[in-house]
From Swiss-Prot:
Gene3D superfamilies: VC0467-like (3.40.1740.10). It comes from the Bacteria. HAMAP family: UPF0301 (MF_00758). Pfam families: DUF179. GO terms for cellular component: cytosol. This is UPF0301 protein Sfri_2850.
């Protein structure tokens, strides 16, 4: 299977009543060792501004009014670790370029920049991540657990988390509710 890096996983309706119900996961890394991604549509119920205050990182007064972003649950693994998906900028301590439109940073310095003139233009803050061991994600896709689409900055950064699953499924070109989760063989 080709790498799914810079793609979205879209949870099939059969995942209802699970941790990943109606989730959209942005794949940050996918290779022969496994995969890592961030769920980008499940708010924790904490605003980024409040998270920054808890970390004793305070916003400049002129930016407080413009910061309206929710902290998301990135996944069930390492929920105490923070990750920021953002538009590219090169001056962070621990950043990885995922695509020409997206970088992943896990260092505190990017959080300190949010709400300042050094902040990335677009960003998503998540706690925890979703991970798959070697061949696990490929098997889940073969089992019709996930559908995939190429990620777009528009969907990643400009759609409200609560609307993302529906918007992502609409990009598939068919009604996801008409799909069967059963795998058939002719």
């Amino acid at each position: 299977m080709d790498s799914l890096k810079d793609h979205f996983l879209i949870a099939m309706p059969s995942l209802d009543d699970t941790f990943f119900e109606r989730s959209v996961i942005y794949i940050c890394e996918h290779d022969q060792k496994g995969a890592m991604g961030l769920m980008v549509n499940r708010p924790i119920g904490v605003e980024v501004e409040d998270l920054l205050e808890q970390m004793e990182l305070y916003l400049s007064p002129e930016f407080v009014f413009s910061l309206d972003s929710q902290v998301l649950i990135g996944g069930p693994v390492a929920p105490e670790r923070g990750f920021v998906l953002h538009t590219p900028q090169q001056h962070w301590v621990n950043s990885t370029e995922i695509s020409e439109d997206t970088m992943l940073t896990s260092s505190r310095d990017i959080l300190a920049s949010i709400g300042s003139d050094k902040s990335p233009e677009n960003f998503v803050v998540a706690l925890g991540y979703s991970g798959w061991s070697k061949d696990q994600l490929e098997q889940e896709i073969a089992d019709n657990t996930w559908l995939t689409i190429k990620a777009t900055p528009e969907l990643l950064f400009n759609v409200e988390p609560e609307q993302m699953w529906l918007m992502a499924t609409q990009q598939l070109g068919f009604d996801i509710w008409q799909m069967s989760s059963q795998v058939g063989h002719a």
